[in-house]
Amino acid sequence: MAEVLSTTAVIKEASTAASTQTLFINGKSFTLDADPKMPILWALRDILGLTGTKYGCGAGLCGACTVHLDGQPVRACLTSLGQAQGKQLTTIEGLDNQKLKNAWAEHNVPQCGYCQAGQLMSAAALVAQHPKPSEEQINSAMSGNICRCGTYPRIKAALQNYAKQEG
């Protein structure tokens, strides 16, 4: 029994071994001593103090933790520091699409606001790829973001309004 415990302890110790991780977040370079398997969500929130990215489910199902990795939306709760090495990471704090943020405000999208960072990050990735997204593209791009308050019609209206302004 003691042998199993010591083996478990060694495995646990090896899996939490910290190493130097260099991240490029919102245009700045950060060096952290952290486990490369650590989800970037925890590095952002607990180490760097960038709390705009929210913890929702921890399983990549709700979209509250959506960030951009080299311009693509990813779930920060599932993406490790190691996967982010050498790539550009953008959080809600670094999102510079003011037109999209204005459309969100004009349509009163946020209610409780908890999911909005993830919603905006998914929407920003969509309009970067498709400046005038179709209804189908909006539905597809936003399908991975859950809103407990049910502001889906407002989200769609905000994105449609954004598309009209781009036209």
Spans of model-derived segments:
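Signature of N-terminal electron-transfer/Fe-S-associated modules in redox systems
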Residues: 2-167
